[in-house]
Amino acid sequence: MTYFLGLTGGIASGKSTADEFFKKKKIPIIDSDLIAHQIMEIGQNGYKAVVDYFGTDILNDDQTINRRKLGGIVFNDKAKLKKLNELTHPLVHQEIKQQMARYRANQEKLVVIDVPLLFESGFESLCNGVLAISITPELQIERLMKRNAFTKKEAVARISNQMPLSEKEKRATYVVANTGTIGDLEKKLSDLLQEIGR
């Protein structure tokens, strides 16, 4: 039986580092962010829905969606963020479920489902267990500013639009703190794989 491990955490908490670890271990990953990017490419259903609603002002000269511009709109307006999620989440969910079915048919032992908004979008019900990557709020702001070249205000706006990490930690099956080095995180993830017997 395939064990589906939901992977979540806050923005800049270290999910990508965890993903890299699982890839090195040859564990398949269903990446919801990647799927969300793919459905917003020219010609895809998500692209049409988003451009129809938000208008052509969000487009680059080559007609691709300017994600920074779209982010600037939705992360400062909760109603518009809600609308963007309503337009894109069903398409992302559909693709995740299709990928899960393929892995189940191939009898994979363990599959990681990386969904930053796992609890917010009700995806935990599809997982056998949920891993939350935890980080302190100060470190989260610092890493996000560094990673995305955000101002402190932009970083705080992005973080405040997500469920508090403390809430995710309470609801998760497993919690791994990412407050040290990459090596520290990888050691904790190795221990976790042993714990779940994979």
Curated annotation (Swiss-Prot):
Catalytic reaction(s) noted: 3'-dephospho-CoA + ATP = ADP + CoA + H(+)
Cell cycle listed as a keyword: no
UniProt keyword list: ATP-binding, Coenzyme A biosynthesis, Cytoplasm, Kinase, Nucleotide-binding, Transferase
Subcellular location: Cytoplasm
Gene3D superfamilies xrefs: P-loop containing nucleotide triphosphate hydrolases
Domain DPCK: residue ranges: 4-198
Keyword Kinase among record annotations: yes
EC number: 2.7.1.24
BP GO terms, sorted: coenzyme A biosynthetic process
The name this protein goes by in its record: Dephospho-CoA kinase
A cellular-component GO term for this protein: cytoplasm
Pfam annotation, one family: CoaE
Predominant localisation class: cytoplasm
Protein family according to the UniProt entry: Belongs to the CoaE family.
